[in-house]
């Protein structure tokens, strides 16, 4: 990792230091995804079969996961893994349940009541990738809040393996969250199928889940077309660590590597006011890299990552808020005392014994988070992501008589005569 001294950088160099790996979508990718989507819309399941054979190397007659498939998955998953997933589900459920909104009502004027009621989104589509490795934890992170929200139907797509099966752990994770409608579909074609529907796959109102550049582009295209809403902008995984001189170098290095191993386009940043800590973390990175099975991937990510020396921790928080990381680790002696300075981050991890990996799997928070600076305006997935908040209002005759004049004045100011007339008729006055 390159080491920079923030105080020695001019404005342009500071911007460059916080620039994420270039995430431009090639015209070729955009066009390829558009063609896949158009093919699925036009030919449905027939297109899905051809695309799946081409990209996944397997011919499927049926995309739906059967009861026999679920049973086989249960038998294939080790008891300790199943128990770990059950434990994770319990904590994810507890955290997300605590944050659920029940709506509210308020009388804004005599005879005028305004309410907010909560309704589940009817049908949602979950995408669980299985590129370099299957991600059953993502099935848990999406399935639990969907269940708590009360969505009428939950559809899950995950890529098939060469033998036509689906990763057993993903299926068990789906079952543990109550998801039983699972399809052996991956990539942009899965997104198209869930957005527009085919003979086998129902169309969904909103799509959730991470994926590669093709999946991300497909989500953006179906959202732009109005076919389905999506959870949030997606991008490569990232972590920013703010560490003081008392931090454990081995812990900090391990946290940086846990994100770097996601992919060569991941980015990790370390901000510290201690030269000694930065130097020690550099040493630990090399020690721990030698033990990783995905060391080559991690090295590629580290090559475009930074360690930044700051003069004071206040400066580190200003930099972090500017960057708006997906994951923010505060490896500080009094981490909670600094929490008030955090303005933009997807998820925050306090202290030496809260690695980001806990949030990825089993602390209870959600690991589907905004990336690429989107944390300035977006939040991670929650139960509310699977719900609609519907406004309701009711006015009595006395209520409209009391506030109607306000509406009349505003309607006239905007030149909307029909608006004014709709109120005036009920009040029995001239518009």
Swiss-Prot record:
The keyword Calcium does not apply. Keywords: Amino-acid biosynthesis, Histidine biosynthesis, Metal-binding, NAD, Oxidoreductase, Zinc. This is Histidinol dehydrogenase. GO terms for biological process: L-histidine biosynthetic process. One of its GO terms (cellular component) is cytosol. NAD(+) binds at residues 127, 189, 212. Catalyzes the sequential NAD-dependent oxidations of L-histidinol to L-histidinaldehyde and then to L-histidine. It comes from Xanthomonas euvesicatoria pv. vesicatoria (strain 85-10) (Xanthomonas campestris pv. vesicatoria). It catalyses: L-histidinol + 2 NAD(+) + H2O = L-histidine + 2 NADH + 3 H(+). Substrate binds at residues 237, 259, 262, 327, 360, 414, 419. One of its GO terms (molecular function) is NAD binding. PROSITE patterns: HISOL_DEHYDROGENASE. Zn(2+) binds at residues 259, 262, 360, 419.
């Amino acid at each position: 990792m390159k080491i920079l001294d923030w105080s020695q950088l001019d404005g342009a160099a500071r911007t460059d230091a916080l620039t994420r790996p270039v995430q431009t979508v090639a015209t070729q990718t955009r066009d390829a995804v558009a063609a896949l989507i158009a093919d699925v819309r036009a030919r449905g399941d027939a297109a899905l079969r051809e695309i799946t054979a081409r990209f996944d190397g397997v011919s499927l007659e049926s995309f739906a996961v059967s009861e026999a498939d679920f049973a086989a998955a249960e038998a294939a998953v080790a008891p300790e893994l199943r128990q770990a997933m059950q434990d994770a589900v319990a904590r994810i459920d507890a955290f997300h349940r605590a944050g659920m909104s029940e709506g509210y009502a308020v009388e804004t004027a005599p005879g005028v009541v305004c309410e907010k009621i909560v309704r589940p989104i009817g049908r949602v589509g979950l995408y669980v990738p299985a590129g370099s490795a299957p991600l059953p934890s993502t099935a848990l992170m999406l399935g639990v809040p969907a269940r708590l929200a009360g969505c009428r139907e939950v559809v899950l797509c995950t890529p098939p393996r060469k033998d036509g099966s689906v990763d057993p752990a993903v299926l068990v994770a789906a079952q543990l969250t109550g998801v039983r409608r699972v399809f052996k579909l991956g990539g942009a074609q899965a997104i198209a199928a869930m957005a527009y529907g085919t003979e086998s796959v129902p169309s969904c109102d909103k799509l959730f889940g991470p994926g590669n550049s093709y999946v991300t582009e497909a989500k953006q295209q179906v959202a732009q077309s109005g076919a389905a809403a999506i959870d949030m902008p997606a991008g490569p995984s990232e972590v920013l660590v703010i560490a003081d001189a008392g931090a454990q170098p081995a812990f900090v290095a391990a946290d940086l590597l846990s994100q770097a191993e996601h992919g060569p386009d991941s980015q990790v940043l370390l901000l510290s006011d201690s030269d000694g800590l930065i130097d020690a973390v550099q040493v630990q990175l090399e020690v721990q890299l030698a033990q990783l099975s995905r060391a080559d991937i991690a090295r590629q990510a580290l090559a475009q990552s930074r360690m930044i020396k700051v003069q004071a921790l206040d400066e580190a928080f200003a930099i972090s808020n500017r960057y708006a990381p997906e994951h923010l680790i505060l490896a500080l002696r009094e981490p909670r005392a600094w929490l008030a300075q955090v303005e933009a981050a997807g998820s925050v991890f306090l202290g030496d014994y809260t690695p980001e990996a806990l949030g990825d799997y089993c602390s209870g928070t959600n690991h589907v988070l905004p990336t690429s600076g989107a944390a300035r305006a977006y939040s991670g997935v929650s139960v509310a992501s699977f719900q609609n908040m519907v406004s309701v209002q009711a006015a009595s005759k006395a209520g409209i008589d009391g506030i109607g004049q306000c509406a009349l004045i505003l309607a006239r100011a905007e030149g909307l005569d029909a608006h004014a007339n709709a109120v005036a008729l009920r009040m029995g006055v001239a518009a």
